[in-house]
Amino acid sequence: MGTVGMLKAAGIGLGDEVIVPAYGNADLADEVVLAGALPVFADIDPATYCLDATAVDAVATARTAAVIVVHRFGRPAELAQLGELGRRRGLLVLEHGESSAPYGEVARRQAHAKYLDGRLTGVRTPEPARGHTYQEYVVRVPGNGRPDRDAFARAIRGKGVDCRVPVKTPVHRLPEFRRNVVLPETERAADETLALPIQGSMTRRELQRLVSACNALGGLLQPAF
């Protein structure tokens, strides 16, 4: 059953609010609208890129009926905190999972991630976590007066690294969902994140080439969250 069906089956529709992340997944906001409810955006945890329980609690109202939690880039959301919030407030908590990969592929990506974690400089590498499958290896490229994310991406693409910006525009900035809300971590993540290649089929030489291309730009500061 899809998100629309699950919301309708739970009796959620006209007059209800459903909290969703604005960092990606415009399709979720669309599905909330199709169910007849109003999508409300909450900020993310800067380490997980998933909904932050404190931020969800802050935007929940008497009209809030559900929260849709998205597991991001292969890292599980903090379901314990969000589940407890749902129980306390009487909210339906739905999970929006990512496509799974064979165990061998996941194991190779995890090994690649460990290699990159120990060798990349000038970018903030993803925070390791139990169960992280590294569907995408997402780093931060803060500006700090030095090469920003977009300039960094152009430079390493020029060296043959196939990187991509995972979320170009947060959902609350799209014309059809524009909201006058303050989501600083969502905005910062959209400005700073860059997905580097981590396919299980990559060779050690390809990983070394990736590291060399990134580290050649060197010296970016890594501010704390």
Model-derived regions: residue spans:
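Active-site phosphate-binding strand-loop segment of PLP-dependent enzymes
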Residues: 47-101
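PLP-dependent aminotransferase class I/II
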Residues: 66-70, 79-81, 88, 100-225
